[in-house]
Each structure stands twice: as structure tokens, then as C-alpha cells.
Design a protein with these regions (language model features):
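Conserved beta-alpha-beta core of the PfkB/ribokinase-like small-molecule kinase fold
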Residues: 136-209
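Single conserved hydrophobic/aromatic residue that forms the stacking wall/gate
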Residues: 208-216
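Short, well-ordered, mixed-charge alpha-helical segments that flank or form enzyme active sites
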Residues: 14, 99, 111-114, 139-142, ...
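Structural motif
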Residues: 5-7, 130-132, 163, 193
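Generic secondary-structure signature for well-ordered alpha-helical cores
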Residues: 12, 16, 70, 74, ...
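Glycine-rich phosphate/adenosyl-contacting loop at the front of the ribokinase-like
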Residues: 1-77, 115-116
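Conserved N-terminal subdomain of the carbohydrate kinase-like
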Residues: 49-135
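Short, contiguous strand/loop micro-motifs
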Residues: 25-27, 52-53, 106-108, 138-139, ...
Length: 216
């Protein structure tokens, strides 16, 4: 089985129980997750050697997030303890014709302020086969975008294949900022995943995508 590294933000999700609206709820259900973390969990469930790299605050909430990953046999040994807080999002679960709602509270989270100095990327990518990230991580902050590129440089140095899920989030950045940042990061990418709307943000030709599609 492959050794796969994913990197991104793990968040605390507070969701209303029983499809209640925010205004009705007196309590929230607690879960931890994130796009890249969920990929690591899925890969671990399929028997792969999956590791998730992130930063969490050095407090009990941060440790709860790490413990949530360990429950699913995701490697967490390179998670940094730094920064002020874990990002939070509130979920109002939809019901019938009423759609779900999400409210984010992730500004100044640990991963958004983390730097290359908080990680040993040479150690992280030693012996790895694959590195996966999404467009969410570089969208979180300029520091996170820089951190993502440092990770990509280290991954390629160690001969690691790289995949990206473009996953454009308009609440995090503009399409102009996304295009500028992601265009720069695409030079490190072997496999690009995205829908037509996502693909418009970066200059990846259809031929390029098809070439990678045939290798999957």
C-alpha cells in the first residue's frame, strides 16, 4: 500500500442536532474534520499508510482534533502545536426544502499562521509516495499559501507524486487571487482534480488533464 501525505486545516465542526435551525438550538454536536483530513481518513480505511500534516493550538481542543484523526489510524506525528486557535465552522443541517447553512470562524487559526519553521518537510516526505492538498489551504492566508509551496518543493525534492483538488471557495478568496496563487502552485502538480468551474481558475489544458486521467 502507498504512503500518502495530506496537508491542510482540521476544523472543529459545531452542528445543530435534529435538523434544528441555529436560532432553535440549545446545544451543538461536535466533530472534527477538513477536506484533506477526510482524504487521509478514507485512505487509512482502505489500508494505506496515510498521514495528515497540520498545525493545531497547544491546548485540549487541539489535542481532541489530533485524537479524532488517530481513531481512524491516521498518522499524526508531524502535526505542529503552534498558533492561537482551531478554526471553527457552524453547520445548520437542512431539512426538506430548507438548505443547510454554514458559518465559518477560522480567522487567525493555527494553520493560517504556521510557517516552514514549524515543520520538518524533509522528514515528512522521506519514503512517501504521494502528497495531496487542496485549494482550500493556500486560500486560508498568505502564510498558508507560502507554507503549501514549501511543502510542494520538498515533496518534489523527494520524488513524491503530487495531486491537488482545486476546490475553489469564494468565501476564502477571490477568483483573481485564486488564479494567481494556484497558477504558481500548479507547476509542482502531477494530477489535478476539479470541476469545470474550478478549472477556469488555473491555466490547465484539457489535454493535460486527460493525460493524467489515463494514469489513474
Amino acid at each position: 500500500m502507498a504512503k500518502v501525505i495530506t496537508m491542510g486545516e482540521i476544523m472543529l465542526r459545531l452542528s445543530t442536532p435534529n435538523n434544528e435551525k441555529f436560532i432553535q438550538a440549545d446545544e451543538f454536536d461536535v466533530n472534527y474534520g477538513g477536506g484533506e483530513a477526510n482524504v487521509a481518513v478514507s485512505l487509512a480505511n482502505y489500508g494505506h499508510d496515510a498521514e495528515f500534516v497540520t498545525a493545531v493550538p497547544d491546548n485540549e481542543i487541539g489535542e481532541c482534533a489530533v485524537a479524532a484523526l488517530r481513531k481512524y489510524n491516521v498518522e499524526t506525528k508531524h502535526i505542529a502545536r503552534c498558533g492561537e486557535r482551531l478554526g471553527i465552522y457552524y453547520l445548520e443541517s437542512g431539512s426538506s426544502m430548507r438548505p443547510s447553512k454554514v458559518v465559518y470562524d477560522r480567522a487567525h487559526s493555527s494553520i493560517s499562521t504556521a510557517t516552514e519553521a514549524d515543520f520538518n518537510f524533509d522528514e515528512i516526505f522521506e519514503g512517501a509516495d504521494w502528497f495531496h492538498f487542496t485549494g482550500i489551504t493556500p486560500a486560508v492566508s498568505d502564510a498558508a499559501a507560502e507554507l503549501t509551496e514549501k511543502a510542494l518543493i520538498a515533496a518534489k525534492k523527494h520524488g513524491v507524486k503530487v495531486s491537488v483538488d482545486l476546490n475553489f471557495r469564494k468565501k476564502l478568496w477571490s477568483s483573481e487571487k485564486a488564479q494567481k496563487v494556484m497558477t504558481n502552485l500548479m507547476k509542482y502538480v502531477d494530477v489535478c482534480i476539479g470541476n469545470e468551474e474550478d478549472a477556469e481558475l488555473v491555466p490547465v489544458s484539457y489535454t493535460h488533464l486527460r493525460a493524467h486521467e489515463t494514469t489513474l
